[in-house]
Amino acid sequence: RQSGAPLTHRPPWQFDASLGERKLRELLGVAHLGGYNAQDLVVAHGAAAALLSYAEHTQGRALAHVRGLTVQRSSELIDLPPATLRNLELIRTLRGEDSPTLLSLLDSCRTGMGSRMLRQWLVNPPRDRSVASARLGAIEQLLAQGEQPLREALRHVSDVQRIASRIALRQVRPRELAGLRETLATLPALLALLPVSDASDGLLAQAAAALTPDPAIHQLIAATLAPEP
């Protein structure tokens, strides 16, 4: 109510923990959730039941694109109540405006994906100092080599997270596929700009591994999509 977001009431049975656990197992194609370290999270199972039921209802189809599960425990994060977030003006001013806030001052991200990640980092800070140190270390490495070439390369990167979701839901538009095509073509240049070596094992090395392109996907999109859809 305070955020102004719409509120939708769901029936109590949709919060049933056993229903949520079954839905998660079916989505992930597993016999149990032990492999995700989520087998004993009864409250989370209930929340998942309602969330998945609501998403299936609004999308009008099964959520075939949900293929993974990441558990983030509250004990791993510093609890920032709404009043604290408001008083610190991390993401909203005391008047409820987007700027000036800590997020608005720090967010010079080139992509929507980066802005969303930065927001998550601010509102869900980790208790483990090594996590924050690793992030700062990666930022220092990037700044040390000069940020402008990387920012220029990121200018050609679309919001892949949202495009992937729209593809899975069969709602993607030709221009979004064109953006994905351009993003895939940009990946080699991005990889070349990351200061990593074969011996690297930090966050940038993880990013480099995740950004390794699949030429087959790029070739398929390039062959089937007009240059200017």
Model-derived features: where do they sit?
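Charged catalytic and DNA/RNA-contacting regions of genome-maintenance
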Residues: 1-141, 148, 155-168, 172-229
